[in-house]
Amino acid sequence: MCGICCSVSFSIEHFSKELKEDLLHNLRRRGPNSSRQLLKSAVNYQCLFSGHVLHLRGVLTIQPVEDEHGNVFLWNGEVFNGVKVEAEDNDTQVMFNSLSACKNESEILLLFSKVQGPWSFIYYQASSHHLWFGRDFFGRRSLLWQFSNLGKSFCLSSVGTQVYGVADQWQEVPASGIFQIDLNSAAVSRSVILKLYPWRYISKEDIAEECGNDLTQTPAGLPEFVSVVINEANLYLSKPVVPLNKKLPESPLEIQCRNSSSTSGTRETLEVFLTDEHTKKIVQQFIAILNVSVKRRILCLAREENLASKEVLKTCSSKANIAILFSGGVDSMVIAALADRHIPLDEPIDLLNVAFVPKQKTGLPIPNIERKQQNHHEIPSEESSQSPAADEGPGEAEVPDRVTGKAGLKELQSVNPSRTWNFVEINVSLEELQKLRRARICHLVQPLDTVLDDSIGCAVWFASRGIGWLVTQDAVRSYKSSAKVILTGIGADEQLAGYSRHRARFQSLGLEGLNEEIAMELGRISSRNLGRDDRVIGDHGKEARFPFLDENVVSFLNSLPVWEKVDLTLPRGVGEKLILRLAAMELGLPASALLPKRAIQFGSRIAKLEKSNEKASDKCGRLQILP
């Protein structure tokens, strides 16, 4: 993962050879392993490229990269499939080499159509004076734009900053395709034309879908001198997933027979489903595809060579490379169980569980606390060593997600007692929440600005920071997760009707309405969730990875009719995400399989910490910068 930025100026007086310090600071936090800036000047414009790398695979490749023709590339992504990247290679260099070899626009689009994995990029073509940029189909990596000074400058960046009273604020680049700007033309005309190469479905007959609403994701707040147009050659990117199967059953009996034996939410209900040969086969296919997704996201990671014996590695000195945002719910439990298959047994897995407490406690509630102030267990000095959370001991925050998290831990320990499962209790006081929201989180959540964005953004920021308590049979100690990769279950609810609004739509409009709701959820996930979560997690120099949004996982689920994935005639805790619950049963997780959906803002209790009478869609004043 990286922090990438390109600042473009069309006038000398508005050009700076350095990024503003607050923006540079935010970018460096995303990429702690290397930083570099590169200036490219032409007759009519200047470009300042800034790259900050979190090194995770292959040889450390310092960004931005430049070739002998003056082309420049910034890459914030992971190639998990589609383009060949050898184990010892770095995907930044592989992608740049492939781009440099492209002879025309069609070849560039073909390259990005092949990539499976999250990405955002900025690519400068020196010979044509074209600047290309964009995000993957789901928008799993953040990219923002800011246009200012009446057409005299603009900036692209992984993360922005908030400044009180400044009108030209950042917006998310829509994940509707790849954009191209002719810099020479923009400089002469004093207007910026964003040429869009949209995503399209390609049929089996190699026919592209008709261009209908390619511009609907374009933000409404662009200044007058900026316009978005579809490229005149009608070129496009091939969507990386198959269309959603909206087939309806020929008769109600086709689905009623599946649950006629029971309408209760019990383990036996799920076991009955698995007695059906067709259902069991689909569930096993789902597990196999999701398993490959998790494997790719775990093995695409450089691990430190450790020559110590296995006996030594089993001690607390072993470092976790993978962490999971963990509530004990079915999403995180299935991810943890599959991750356990591929992570070396002598390597711990960090389970990050966050809770918010209403007021600061004084003192430590448990005597004989063993504080480890060395190696990766050290409480770091930056923003945290004297923070209220350091005084919030374990056992002080038995919120719903803590209760289900501990139950999930026991279930995982029974599945694999040989694994070291680090259940990290992350307790956040109101004082620390307010302090770090002002200092850090508000800059990351923006340009999203609702109460829901505030709650989720803050919860994910503290969880992914990984500073808390590690409670074992022998001791309780302060702990900081060393994992650079964080797996999260986002995407499961959107695809598998996990939200209450899915059930409401089903009750009012049946399966047809449910299909439309699922399509809408997946279509807006880039603008609603993923850019924000990437900025929030990346702020700790860590990378978010989303197994449920692997292209093959989404294609498999999209190919199934809705009644083979969910059954909302059954009660909460069974009917929604049914195929995932059945997978949990197959993986030996029967208790977790029956837990109903609980959103992180409620499970962690952050929603009740401040104003409890707000609506999720309200604009959140706590995210605004004050004078």
Swiss-Prot record:
The active site is at C2. SUPFAM superfamilies: Adenine nucleotide alpha hydrolases-like, N-terminal nucleophile aminohydrolases (Ntn hydrolases). Keywords: Amino-acid biosynthesis, Asparagine biosynthesis, Glutamine amidotransferase. One of its GO terms (molecular function) is asparagine synthase (glutamine-hydrolyzing) activity. It holds the Pfam family Asn_synthase. CDD domains: Asn_synthase_B_C (cd01991), Gn_AT_II_novel (cd03766). InterPro entries: Asn_synthase, Asn_synthetase_domain, GATase_2_dom, Ntn_hydrolases_N, Rossmann-like_a/b/a_fold. Residues 308-597 form the Asparagine synthetase domain. Signal peptide: none annotated. One of its GO terms (biological process) is asparagine biosynthetic process. PROSITE patterns: GATASE_TYPE_2 (PS51278). This is Asparagine synthetase domain-containing protein 1. The gene is Asnsd1.
